């Protein structure tokens, strides 16, 4: 039996859903699942220190291969002692493959069997990223969990295109496995693609499961499809993945999507959503989204969320935070970012307890009755 550097341990399966309580063991520590992972694109979660992330309860964070390759460079990070040392983070790190960022550059990229040619978004120079190069960069970064290089087709692409795409992604996954220099201390995940086509998702999953990765990601979702379409894909995709390995849904961070993903057996999630909307003054609360810049909060001296015990809510009022953001003070963004990250990490803590108590469906109903499926200011 293969001795993987990444191991999944099931603690409890929820009686009424596909949800599972567990933990993932990595070379830099163990974290509980289901877990939301804050995104630190440039080797930092925007405006948050490592100490703050630990206080929030972030057991693992994500960094971006594409951006770190371009700046400051993966070889420089390797010379510094690796990404953990470079950014002073001694807990697990997951890196993506760079594929999603490359495919976001739709107007300036060319896909071939060898890899992808694209324009550097910083200076316009021509760049080439292959499965082997994506693995080499991540080996230099030294992340605990790495991603295979894949193509992320748009959800509504034609069937024939998606079929060719997933077959190429499977070939790229095999090439990446062969190029992986550090299988003893870095776990490489395969990424299941296939847009909304069940037979293609089945084909992609079968190809990757046969390669025996230590974990599996579900890609190609949260790219414009409806919530119902995402759930339908998860319904037929997650059961295709091994029960004894981690399952990671990429790019998902809306609270309702997190809970529905857990119900369908997903263990890990990431998204830039909490910090991105925080910078615009949008805060997640137990009563829905709150747009703190609105004038009605100018003399509101209550916390962002009456049910939240995070540092922001314990110490600062809506009026003060609104003032900071209106005055373009960075501290305001720090406070809203901290709160939103805490909200999602703490939500997953509550979800884990609901799995333990076998009442996740009731928890979902109660939560969404108050939160309101991401509708802004539902009860304000």
UniProtKB/Swiss-Prot annotation:
Necessary cofactors: Zn(2+)
Example GO BP: tRNA wobble guanine modification
Any GO molecular function: tRNA-guanosine(34) queuine transglycosylase activity
EC numbers on record: 2.4.2.29
Residues engaged in binding Zn(2+): 308, 310, 313, 339
Pathway the protein acts in: tRNA modification; tRNA-queuosine biosynthesis
Positions of the UniProt region annotated as RNA binding: 251-257, 275-279
One Pfam family from the record: TGT
Binding of substrate, residues: 96-100, 150, 193, 220
The reaction(s) this protein catalyses: 7-aminomethyl-7-carbaguanine + guanosine(34) in tRNA = 7-aminomethyl-7-carbaguanosine(34) in tRNA + guanine
Class of enzymatic activity (EC top level): transferase
Keywords annotated in UniProt: Glycosyltransferase, Metal-binding, Queuosine biosynthesis, Transferase, tRNA processing, Zinc
Enzyme active site: 96, 270
GO cellular-component term (any): cytosol
Co-factor binding details: Binds 1 zinc ion per subunit.
NCBIfam families reported in the protein's UniProt record: Q_tRNA_tgt, tgt_general
Function: Catalyzes the base-exchange of a guanine (G) residue with the queuine precursor 7-aminomethyl-7-deazaguanine (PreQ1) at position 34 (anticodon wobble position) in tRNAs with GU(N) anticodons (tRNA-Asp, -Asn, -His and -Tyr). Catalysis occurs through a double-displacement mechanism. The nucleophile active site attacks the C1' of nucleotide 34 to detach the guanine base from the RNA, forming a covalent enzyme-RNA intermediate. The proton acceptor active site deprotonates the incoming PreQ1, allowing a nucleophilic attack on the C1' of the ribose to form the product.
Record family assignment: Belongs to the queuine tRNA-ribosyltransferase family.
Cross-referenced PANTHER family: QUEUINE TRNA-RIBOSYLTRANSFERASE
Subunit structure and binding partners: Homodimer. Within each dimer, one monomer is responsible for RNA recognition and catalysis, while the other monomer binds to the replacement base PreQ1.
Protein name: Queuine tRNA-ribosyltransferase
Species of provenance: Streptococcus pyogenes serotype M1
Top-level taxonomy: Bacteria, Bacillati, Bacillota, Bacilli, Lactobacillales
């Amino acid at each position: 039996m293969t001795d993987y550097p990444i191991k999944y341990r099931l603690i409890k399966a929820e009686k009424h859903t596909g949800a599972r309580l567990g933990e993932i063991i990595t070379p830099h520590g163990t974290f509980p699942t289901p877990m939301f992972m804050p995104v630190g694109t440039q080797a930092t979660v925007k405006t948050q220190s490592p100490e703050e992330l630990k206080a929030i309860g972030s057991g693992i964070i994500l960094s971006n291969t594409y951006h770190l390759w371009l700046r400051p460079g993966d070889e420089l990070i390797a010379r510094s002692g690796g990404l953990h040392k470079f950014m002073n983070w001694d807990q697990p790190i997951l890196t993506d493959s760079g594929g999603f960022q490359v495919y976001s550059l739709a107007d300036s990229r060319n896909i071939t069997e060898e890899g992808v040619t694209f324009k550097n978004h910083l200076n316009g120079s021509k760049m080439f990223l292959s499965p082997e190069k994506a693995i080499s960069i991540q080996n230099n970064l030294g992340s605990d969990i790495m991603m295979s290089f894949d193509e992320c087709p748009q959800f509504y692409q034609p069937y024939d295109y998606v079929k060719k795409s997933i077959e190429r992604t499977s070939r790229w996954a095999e090439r990446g496995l062969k190029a992986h220099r550090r299988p003893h201390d870095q776990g490489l995940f395969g990424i299941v693609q296939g847009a909304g086509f069940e037979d293609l998702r089945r084909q992609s999953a079968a190809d990757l499961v046969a390669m025996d990765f230590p974990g599996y990601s579900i890609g190609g979702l949260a790219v414009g499809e409806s919530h119902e379409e995402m759930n339908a894909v998860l319904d037929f995709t997650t059961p295709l993945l091994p029960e004894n390995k981690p399952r990671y849904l990429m790019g998902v961070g809306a609270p309702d999507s997190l809970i529905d993903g857990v119900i369908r057996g997903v263990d890990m999630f990431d998204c830039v959503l909490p910090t991105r909307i925080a910078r615009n003054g949008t805060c997640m609360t137990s009563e829905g989204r709150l747009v703190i810049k609105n004038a009605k909060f100018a003399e509101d001296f209550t916390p962002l969320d009456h049910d939240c015990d995070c540092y922001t809510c314990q110490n600062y009022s809506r009026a003060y935070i609104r003032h900071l953001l209106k005055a373009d003070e960075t501290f305001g963004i720090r406070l809203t970012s901290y709160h939103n990250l805490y909200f999602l990490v703490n939500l997953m803590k509550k979800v884990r307890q609901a799995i333990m108590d076998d009442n996740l469906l009731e928890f979902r109903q109660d939560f969404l009755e108050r939160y309101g499926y991401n509708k802004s200011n539902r009860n304000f």
